Structures are given as structure tokens and as C-alpha cells.
């Protein structure tokens, strides 16, 4: 599995990654190790992306197929995570700034972007539109810092503990997001 993964990553890094799949498809070489790739539309491979991680994340496969492929080839967790994140959140971010604050906050939380924005930034890098990507960099990334700095008023914070505190903080963050999104 490790050797097949190494060759797979080399193919993803190649100038023409589709050739790897074409050759294996022509000799029925995909069936054992890469069966999910047999029906994959090769014209949809992300040729304009040089990084194997980005190309893997953009493979035109279903979530189940990506999961099975990653497990079989013992792919590094970052590759599977990038693909799952893309499938889960790219569409939401593509609607920027006409997104629902609650949905956006849920995505930010699940990506743990208030603590480390790398996963969110990778999704943004996977966008086809440089204009939208730059807009998100200008608007969403600073908004994360603002969200992180939001706090409950002291009198309200003093009366809440545990899950109730977290729910109240989420509520003010979602409200803040909705207000900011409406102003964009």
C-alpha cells in the first residue's frame, strides 16, 4: 500500500496527472488498488494545481470513494482531511458573502479555524475563482480574529457555566457574523 501511495502521489505531482490514470485504465491496472478511479472523469483532474495535496482534495470522487481510497492506500491523514473539508465546506464558502451566519460559524467551529486557520485557508486555495479567494482572505480571515475576541458581557458570563456558557458565546458570535455579513 505504501508503494502504491508513493506512486499515486508522484502521479498527482506530475505535469499531466491524467496520464497515470489513462495508462492504468488501458491495462486494467486500476481494479486492484484504485477501483474508485476507474470511472473518474480524467478531464476534471485539477491540472492547474501543482500540489499533490490539492489535487487529491479536488479528485472528482464521492466522499465514500475518497475515504475508501485513502484507507486502502494508507494515505496521510492530511490528504483525506483536505478532501473531506473541500466536500463539506467549499460550496458554502463559494457563496460568500451571501452565507448564513449559523452555517458559517458551524463550519468555522468544525474546521477549528478560530484556533488554527490552516484547514480553512486550504479550502480557500482550492477555489477556482482568484477574485473570491482574495475577497475571503480580505474579509473572512480578519473576521475570524474578531470572532475569537468576542466575549460575553461580564454580568452574563458570571451567571453561566459549562455548556450554557458555550451556547451563549456561540449565540453572540452567530449574531455578530450575521450583522457583519449583512454589511458586506
Q: Positions of the model-derived regions?
A:
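Charged substrate- and nucleic-acid-binding regions of tRNA-handling and nucleotidyl-transfer enzymes
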Residues: 113-184
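Conserved, hydrophobic alpha-helical core segments of structured domains
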Residues: 1-133
Amino acid at each position: 500500500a505504501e508503494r502504491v501511495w508513493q506512486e499515486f502521489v508522484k502521479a498527482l505531482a506530475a505535469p499531466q496527472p491524467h496520464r497515470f490514470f489513462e495508462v492504468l485504465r488501458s491495462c486494467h491496472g486500476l481494479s486492484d488498488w484504485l477501483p474508485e478511479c476507474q470511472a473518474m472523469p480524467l478531464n476534471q483532474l485539477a491540472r492547474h494545481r501543482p500540489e499533490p495535496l490539492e489535487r487529491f482534495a479536488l479528485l472528482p470522487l464521492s466522499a465514500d470513494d475518497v475515504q475508501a481510497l485513502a484507507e486502502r492506500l494508507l494515505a496521510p491523514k492530511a490528504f483525506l482531511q483536505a478532501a473531506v473539508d473541500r466536500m463539506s465546506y467549499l460550496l458554502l464558502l463559494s457563496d460568500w458573502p451571501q452565507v448564513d451566519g449559523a452555517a458559517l460559524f458551524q463550519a468555522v467551529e468544525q474546521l477549528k479555524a478560530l484556533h488554527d486557520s490552516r484547514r480553512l485557508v486550504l479550502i480557500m486555495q482550492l477555489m477556482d475563482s482568484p477574485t473570491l479567494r482574495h475577497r475571503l482572505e480580505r474579509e473572512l480571515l480578519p473576521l475570524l480574529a474578531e470572532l475569537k475576541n468576542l466575549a460575553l458581557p461580564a454580568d452574563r458570563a458570571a451567571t453561566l457555566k459549562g455548556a450554557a456558557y458555550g451556547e451563549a458565546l456561540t449565540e453572540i458570535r452567530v449574531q455578530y457574523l450575521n450583522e457583519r455579513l449583512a454589511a458586506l
